[in-house]
Amino acid sequence: MTKQHAFTREDLLRCSRGELFGPGNAQLPAPNMLMVDRITHISDEGGKFGKGELVAELDINPDLWFFACHFEGDPVMPGCLGLDAMWQLVGFYLGWQGNPGRGRALGSGEVKFFGQVLPTAKKVTYNIHIKRVLKGKLNLAIADGSVSVDGREIYTAEGLRVGVFTSTENF
């Protein structure tokens, strides 16, 4: 079976309902926490480390929910949502590779914010570079990522860690 290398918004919504990788396996969050509109490229080769990469996008418009509350009179997308989007994509990668279980963000190394997403922006682009995938009792991916707005890099994160668990009872 050939792997799909791009995913539409509808595909991602299917993933949020648990329909893309099967019951009990990796899911994306549902809207409003789903911070990705499409994955334009996913591969288990390439990227900075030669172990895989993802490129995904989020369309920005002034009506997005977070602009109304963060901050009143000074709307900006919370940086933590961009960080969460990168974790979402690393978890998606594990599911796409066929690793069973539910995804959980496990941490990251250094995170830097040096720009912002305003309601006047058009598009956020996420770039994820897989560093390592560990398979065993716990299937874990480690990646570096960046967030760009309208072509300008504004956040970076090193050592993004996501695991998939067949049971989250004792997590």
Curated annotation (Swiss-Prot):
Substrates-to-products reaction catalysed? a (3R)-hydroxyacyl-[ACP] = a (2E)-enoyl-[ACP] + H2O; (3R)-hydroxydecanoyl-[ACP] = (2E)-decenoyl-[ACP] + H2O; (2E)-decenoyl-[ACP] = (3Z)-decenoyl-[ACP]
Q: Which GO terms describe its biological process?
A: unsaturated fatty acid biosynthetic process
List the molecular function annotations (GO) for this entry.
(3R)-hydroxyacyl-[acyl-carrier-protein] dehydratase activity; trans-2-decenoyl-acyl-carrier-protein isomerase activity
Active-site residues, Swiss-Prot/TrEMBL: H70
**Is the keyword Lyase in the record?**
yes
Location (main, coarse): cytoplasm
* UniProt pathway annotation: Lipid metabolism; fatty acid biosynthesis
Look up the EC number in the record and give it: 4.2.1.59, 5.3.3.14
Cellular component annotations (GO), alphabetically ordered? cytoplasm
Membrane-crossing segments per the record:
none
InterPro entries to which the protein is assigned, alphabetical = FabA (IPR010083), FabA_FabZ (IPR013114), HotDog_dom_sf (IPR029069)
State whether keyword Glycosyltransferase applies: no
Its subunit composition reads: Homodimer.
Please explain the role this protein plays, according to its UniProt record.
Necessary for the introduction of cis unsaturation into fatty acids. Catalyzes the dehydration of (3R)-3-hydroxydecanoyl-ACP to E-(2)-decenoyl-ACP and then its isomerization to Z-(3)-decenoyl-ACP. Can catalyze the dehydratase reaction for beta-hydroxyacyl-ACPs with saturated chain lengths up to 16:0, being most active on intermediate chain length.
Q: NCBIfam families from the xrefs?
A: fabA, PRK05174.1
Concerning its family, UniProt says: Belongs to the thioester dehydratase family. FabA subfamily.
| Alphabetical list of HAMAP family matching this protein | FabA (MF_00405)
Task: Tell me the protein's name.
Answer: 3-hydroxydecanoyl-[acyl-carrier-protein] dehydratase
